[in-house]
Each structure stands twice: as C-alpha cells, then as structure tokens.
Amino acid sequence: MGRAKKVVLAYSGGVDTSVCIPYLKHEWGVEEVITLAADLGQGDELEPIRKKALDAGAAQSLIADGTESFIADYAFPAIQANALYENRYPLSTALARPLIAKLLVEAAEIHGADAVAHGCTGKGNDQVRFDVSITALNPDIKVLAPAREWGMSREETIAYGEKYGVQSPVKKSSPYSIDRNLLGRSVEAGPLEDPWVEPLEEVYDLTKAIADTPDQPEYVDIDFAQGLPTQLNGQALSPVALVEQLNQIVGNHGVGRIDMVENRLVGIKSREIYEAPALLVLIQAHRELESLALTADVTHYKRGIEETYSQLVYNGLWFSPLKDALDAFIQQTQKQVTGTVRVKLFKGAATVVGRQSPHSLYTPDLATYGAEDAFDHKAAEGFIYVWGLPTRVWSQQQR
C-alpha cells in the first residue's frame, strides 16, 4: 500500500521537485501526483514549468497566482512589524512559505488529495515552514517530503530523474542555489559556502554594482496610511505595483544587498546572500515614521515584539496563536502611523532625510533651542532629583 493515494506537490521546476514526481509514484506507490507552482511575482514564465511537470508524470499541473496576496497579506504586515531576522534579513523568502502552504492545502481540499508534498531536504528551514504551516491549516492531511528521506546525492538525484525523463536544468557554470519572488532573491551554495570569499558580481541581479550606479542622488517619497505603504512620489499604487516600482528605483542605486551568516532553525549556520531593495527601504522608512507617531514606551516595547515576530516567521510559525496575538498588538500600534517619509538613494546607501505626519508627536517649540523654546527648564531639577533618587539611596547605602 502506498503512502498516499493522491498528492499535491509544491513544484518549482527544479531538480528536486521534478524528481519527486516519479519518486512518489514509483517508490512510494502514489497513484496520482498533482503539481502546484505558485506565482509570487518571481518573473519566470510558468507555462514551461507546467509542461515540465506533465512530462515528468504529473496527472495535473496547476499554477496559482498568489502575488497580490503575497504582498498585501504577508509582506505588508511584516513591514508594519519592522520584521528583520537577526536585525538584518527582511524575511523575503520566509514570508512566501506560509502562503505556498496555504495554496497547497486549498488545492488538496479542492482535488480530494489525502496528502501534500514538497521537495525540501532535511537541512534547511523550508521543510519546517512547510510542514508546520500545513499542519496548522489542516492537521488531518499527510505531509510527504521525499527529498528528506531518499538519501541520494545531487548526482544520484539527477541520474534518477533522467531515468524517468526528467532533464536537469543545472548548469555547471552556475553553482548557486537561487530562490526568487517579487520581494527579492536569496542565493547560497557554491563558492558562497566559504564565508571569507567575496561574492562575484554575477551573484546579484536586482541591484547594480556601486560602480554602475548613477552619480547623482535620487529622492523617493513614500506615503503610509496606518503603517501600510500607499503612495510612491505622490502616486497612489497597488501594493504589487508599489513594490515593483520601488524595486527598480532602489536597485538602480545599488541598495538592497545583504551578505550574512545566519542561524538556521535546524542548528547550523549558513552564509546567505539576499537582495530585497524595496522591502528593506520600506521597513527603514516605516520605522522612521513610527519615531514621529508612537510614544516612547510603545516604541521601545514594540522593538521586542518585532524581534519575536521575526523569529516566529523565520521559524515557520506564521499560523500560530502567538503570531495572532502579536498581530493584534502591532495593528493597535499602527493606527496613527500615517505620513510621508523621504529617502535619499545614492551609491549603495538609503538615507532617510525627511519625515512628516499629521499625528506627529514631535513638537518644535519644545524641541528647539531657539527663542521659541517653550520647555520649562526649571522643572528639570525636580524631575532629575526624583528620577535619580533610587540611585542616590543605593549609593548612600554602599558607604
């Protein structure tokens, strides 16, 4: 008896997911494999991917357009949370996984499948993100992960696929593992596995080399409404269009590159290259707007929430009670986060040079050192005495 009768497989067109099709059928006794490729704005032509799945033995090959939901329902809430894993990575790849899991479960329920499958190995984060998200959405559905169990090397995997007509797309001149969506790219493997080796320029695609960027700065005005990006340079745009345009503008100035060694959930360190031009600038601008609109205590407390939020998303817990609770807190904080932020882009740097908000708590006549100063300086002495009283008492006790 096979492990499942009908399976919906998350499909990318790569070696592992292509080999999963015959492997599920011939090794695990699956009667019918339906593939699902998610369009998340990665820019690939998906029709060849559909054909490749059918040629590899899939009974059906589905394509789900999730781009709008990806930006509006996943990326924009992460911007409100200023989500940066380990204070650097804006989760451009991690944010896609819960949506793909959701699309898989929906397809399985529509087509009457008793299992879903993915091509993740046992070494990365994505296996956790998929398995946990799928289980959270439908605890009764089976999750199959052939690449986690088959024990084949890369060469053996390719050879197995060729036996069933699966052609390898890997070129010897491109040793990298690349994942891409509308938010950005992640690149790993090959020469990048040595953290001392500087990435070649060929690694990057969305951002220009500094030598090729314009010799004049460019200014971008980004409007937010309750923490959500709404306009670019005074033009109202849909979430997808805003990210698309901002990616082009920001990447043209060489902004948006990350080279980091991160701590994976499975306990190993991994050297990753990320490009996320628009997402990084949107988080930077959003955080600056919060500095105007939020009180000091909310701002400081939210920083801890942001770190927990980022870890949850990175660790595959998008669909979890704690994530829901954090969402409620974050949404409460965003009610007054409305305004405009001006960002200067020049030679690989994005610098916030202006911010304004109708809900700004910045009071010029209290902040100024000029003649308009309305701050009561005499009140400072009593405040300092009370504020420092515990320290004074402690110091006296030590004598």
Swiss-Prot record:
Compartments, as annotated in UniProt: Cytoplasm
**GO annotation, cellular component aspect:** cytoplasm
Going by the UniProt record, its keywords in alphabetical order are: Amino-acid biosynthesis, Arginine biosynthesis, ATP-binding, Cytoplasm, Ligase, Nucleotide-binding
Where L-aspartate is bound, by residue?
121, 125-126
Q: Name one GO molecular function term.
A: argininosuccinate synthase activity
UniProt xrefs under InterPro entries: Arginosuc_syn_C, Arginosuc_syn_N, Arginosuc_synth, Arginosuc_synth_CS, Arginosuc_synth_type_1_subfam, AS_cat/multimer_dom_body, Rossmann-like_a/b/a_fold
Q: What is its EC number?
A: 6.3.4.5
**What reaction is this protein's catalytic activity?**
L-citrulline + L-aspartate + ATP = 2-(N(omega)-L-arginino)succinate + AMP + diphosphate + H(+)
Q: What is its main location?
A: cytoplasm
Enumerate the CDD domains for this protein.
ASS
Biological process according to GO? argininosuccinate metabolic process; L-arginine biosynthetic process; urea cycle
Detail which positions bind ATP: 10-18, 38, 119
The pathway that the record names for this protein is: Amino-acid biosynthesis; L-arginine biosynthesis; L-arginine from L-ornithine and carbamoyl phosphate: step 2/3
Please give the Pfam families that the UniProt record associates with this protein: Arginosuc_syn_C, Arginosuc_synth
Enzymatic class:
ligase
- Where is L-citrulline bound in this sequence? 89, 125, 129, 177, 186, 262, 274
Family, per the entry? Belongs to the argininosuccinate synthase family. Type 1 subfamily.
Quaternary state and interactors: Homotetramer.
Q: Which PANTHER family match?
A: ARGININOSUCCINATE SYNTHASE
The entry's protein name is Argininosuccinate synthase
Give the source species: Acaryochloris marina (strain MBIC 11017)
